[in-house]
Swiss-Prot record:
Binds 16S rRNA, required for the assembly of 30S particles and may also be responsible for determining the conformation of the 16S rRNA at the A site. Belongs to the universal ribosomal protein uS14 family. GO terms for molecular function: rRNA binding; structural constituent of ribosome. Keywords: Ribonucleoprotein, Ribosomal protein, RNA-binding, rRNA-binding. Part of the 30S ribosomal subunit. Contacts proteins S3 and S10. Coiled coil: none annotated. It comes from the Bacteria. Transmembrane segments: none annotated. GO terms for biological process: translation. It comes from Chlorobium limicola (strain DSM 245 / NBRC 103803 / 6330). This is Small ribosomal subunit protein uS14. GO terms for cellular component: cytoplasm; small ribosomal subunit.
Amino acid sequence: MAKKSIIARNEKRKKLVEKYAAKREELLKAGDYEALRKLPRDSSATRVKNRCVLTGRGRGVYEKFGLCRQMFRKFALEGKLPGVKKASW
C-alpha cells in the first residue's frame, strides 16, 4: 500500500487541477504563457497520477476500473466486477 502522504498529495493535486482548469484553458487560448507560468505547478493535469482507489498503487492501474492489476484480478476471480470473466478459447 502506498504511503498516505503520497495519496494525500495526489488528492491535493486533483483539487488544484479542478480549481484552475477553466483559468488554464482561458490562458492557453489567449496564448498568455507568462500568466500561465505563474499558476501553481500542481494545477497542471499532467502532475496527477492515476492510482488504485483501494491500495494507492501508482503502477499497473486500469483506468476504467480505478484498480491496480492485483486488485482487479482478485475481484474479477471473486466475481465482484460485473461483466468481467476469465478468458478462455
